[in-house]
Amino acid sequence: MTVERPPESSVEPAQPGGPGVPRPIVAGVVGGVSVIVIALSAWLALRPGAEKAQTGLVHWFNDPPQPFAALFAVANPFLRPVPLAVVAIVLMGWVLLTRPGSAHRLAVMRAFVATFLLAQLMTQVLKHVANQPRPIHVIPDLDTHGYPTSPHGNAYPSAHTAVVVAAVCALWPWMRWPQRVAGLVFAALTACNRIYIGAHWPIDVVGGIAIGLLSGAITWLIAARWPIQETR
């Protein structure tokens, strides 16, 4: 007499922390690489002649050829401080509306707030460490393209880039593919815009991207270690 075994479920066990939250090893690799990039980019930013080496690329972004000129000009009004914050909040709201269950929504909000605070903290600390002037204070006749105020503080790293990349990275596990595409476009345009208006050097943007990825990776670890359970 043979005993039939119950069929095995074809459904894979859910990842801890929510749908698609990367495993701790993945978050650790992303975070580790980001730390290396931050250290290397900060070192390069402080090297003698760093501004001169990047001047040509700054000129290209400040007065780019078509179709980049048209693309940057259209995106520019939406990437100023207030519109940028609105776009980021709208992106988070879009993700919230498409995630079922209060636990997922709470996880999204926790990730968004945590990554914002982490990115801001890291950028402000590094701005006090890296004493690098902004391109508009070094290169004459740069076009700010209507930026409402003169950027304050040191150039390295780009806080705007760091925060936007951090938000997209942190929310990535809960995003559907259209939201991921929109997030990547948003982050790429923000990074390019910071050079376009003369507020940052390319190395500042590289540092900002790395800080954003590190902040996002930390929120992945938080989501995996302390998942928010659905209440009944």
Feature locations, PLM:
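Aromatic-anchored segments of alpha-helical transmembrane domains
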Residues: 37-41, 117-124, 185-199
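Membrane-helix interface segments
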Residues: 67-68, 102-108, 136, 175-181
